[in-house]
């Protein structure tokens, strides 16, 4: 791949638009570094709008350098499609961790849940405050904060990933008014209404994630996408203390 700079080891995950591989960055004298490689699926490589979004993600990621955000290392093209080379996080995403714990009949422990949320918020705060080379605010909004996009390494590092739906002032591809982006269950009410969003939408989504970690159940999940969106718009949040007595009053107020 890409003039032998990268070697694919195994496929890690695949979605409807891209697939992610574990790979190695190769260089002189046997140099090798483990990386993650996100590749556009071949049938989308000729879709100009999607490629524009993919390149926006790469450019935006390359600007960011923070311990709680997955680093973008390179971008390239091979086999008639594009790929992004990213920092490899040896661990699991939060969705997988929550699902494993739920099978055991327990939520994420309180201390760990708060730690994960705080670390993810540090990464988001950095992104929200990022400026361009001239000191102008980039106005970054992730727009897809959810358990699959929060990675936890085996060493306990927490990293936000996948800025593929992010909004920023530098984007080449703009979102049309009224278009909803992000997973329905983690939208802010204004996003569910198709209104413009700012960084508060990310904080709302992070609050949902924290609530779900501690409650051990989903917050906004209907029998259909339509019902889920209606629940988000209503934004009725049940008392966390009533579900998990370990949640103290101060945490309840924050959420």
Task: Locate the predicted segments by residue.
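Activation segment of protein kinases
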Residues: 45-49, 154-196, 223
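Protein kinase catalytic-loop region centered on the HRD/HxD motif
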Residues: 122-140
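C-terminal lobe helix-coil module of Hanks-type protein kinase domains
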Residues: 148-151, 161, 185-255
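Activation-segment/catalytic-loop signature of the eukaryotic protein kinase fold
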Residues: 75
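AlphaC helix of the eukaryotic protein kinase fold
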Residues: 41-63
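Conserved short submotifs of the Hanks-type protein kinase catalytic core
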Residues: 79-93, 97
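Protein kinase glycine-rich loop
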Residues: 9-16, 20
């Amino acid at each position: 791949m890409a003039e032998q700079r990268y070697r694919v080891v195994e496929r890690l995950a695949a979605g409807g638009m891209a697939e992610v591989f574990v790979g190695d960055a190769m260089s002189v004298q046997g140099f090798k570094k483990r990386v993650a490689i996100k590749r556009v699926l071949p049938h989308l490589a000729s879709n100009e709008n999607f490629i524009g979004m993919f390149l926006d993600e790469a450019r935006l990621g390359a600007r960011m350098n923070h311990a709680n955000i997955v680093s973008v290392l390179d971008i390239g093209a091979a086999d008639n499609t594009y790929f992004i080379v990213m920092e490899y996080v040896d661990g699991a995403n939060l969705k997988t961790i929550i699902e494993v714990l739920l099978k055991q009949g327990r939520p994420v422990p309180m201390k760990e849940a708060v730690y994960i949320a705080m670390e993810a918020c540090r990464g988001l705060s950095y992104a929200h405050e990022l400026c361009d080379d001239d000191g102008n605010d980039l106005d970054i909004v992730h727009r897809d904060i959810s358990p699959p996009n929060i990675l936890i390494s085996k060493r306990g590092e927490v990293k936000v990933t996948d800025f593929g739906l992010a909004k920023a002032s530098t984007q080449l591809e703009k979102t049309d008014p009224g278009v909803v982006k992000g997973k329905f269950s983690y939208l802010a009410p204004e996003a569910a209404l198709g209104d413009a969003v700012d960084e508060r939408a990310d904080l709302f989504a992070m609050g949902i994630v924290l609530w779900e970690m501690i409650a051990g159940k989903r917050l906004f999940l209907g029998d259909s996408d339509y019902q889920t969106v209606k629940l988000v718009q209503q934004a009725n949040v049940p008392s966390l203390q009533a579900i998990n007595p370990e949640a103290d009053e101060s945490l309840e107020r924050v959420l």
